[in-house]
Amino acid sequence: MAKMTLSSYMLMLAFSLFSQGILLSASKSIRNLEDDIVFNTFRMGKAFQKEDTAERSVVAPSLEQYKNDESGFMNDDDNKNSKNTGSKQNLVTHGLPLSLAVKPYLALKGSVAFPAENGVQNAESTQEKREIGDEENSAKFPIGRRDFDMLRCMLGRVYRPCWQV
């Protein structure tokens, strides 16, 4: 009886392993998908930088270039080398987002976009902020400064207990 249950378990295990091994999956590689998103982000950044958004409409990657081939979204290049799985139909059913909510770095202006130009001014203003306050007059500091000191204390970067902040 024990040999029969052991052999039936081994048979079920072998069947499950072989049934999963026969099926081959094909999908669009994540690298190609990320490259498309990065390319479209830079394209949108250039449009924002030139401020011609009214004349030129920038569209996110459309779903027409991707085909639903029962296993995911695939490019036309990837369709030539793909194999049909059949059983993994509903793994990827949501698709790509229609609009990217990411602001590209190229769209930023001023000191945020080019911090190297304003580096000297930022260093001087930081030094002035450090020289202004004493630790005895911590009420003059904004709340953010006291929170920062508390976080430094909690991280263990200073050699004093947290209640002395």
Curated annotation (Swiss-Prot):
One of its GO terms (molecular function) is melanin-concentrating hormone activity. Disulfide bonds join 153-162. InterPro entries: Prepro-melanin_conc_hormone. One of its GO terms (cellular component) is extracellular region. Its main location: secreted. Keywords: Amidation, Cleavage on pair of basic residues, Disulfide bond, Hormone, Neuropeptide, Secreted, Signal. The modification Isoleucine amide is found at residue 143. Pro-MCH is processed differentially in the brain and in peripheral organs producing two neuropeptides; NEI and MCH. A third peptide, NGE, may also be produced. Preferential processing in neurons by prohormone convertase 2 (PC2) generates NEI. MCH is generated in neurons of the lateral hypothalmic area by several prohormone convertases including PC1/3, PC2 and PC5/6. Predominantly expressed in hypothalamus. Also found in heart, intestine, spleen and testis (spermatogonia, early spermatocytes and Sertoli cells). In brain only mature MCH and NEI peptides are present. In peripheral tissues a large product, encompassing the NEI and MCH domains of the precursor, is found predominantly. It is found in: Secreted. Residues 66-89 are annotated as: Disordered. Residues 1-21 form the signal peptide. GO terms for biological process: chemical synaptic transmission; feeding behavior; neuropeptide signaling pathway. Belongs to the MCH family. MCH may act as a neurotransmitter or neuromodulator in a broad array of neuronal functions directed toward the regulation of goal-directed behavior, such as food intake, and general arousal. This is Pro-MCH.
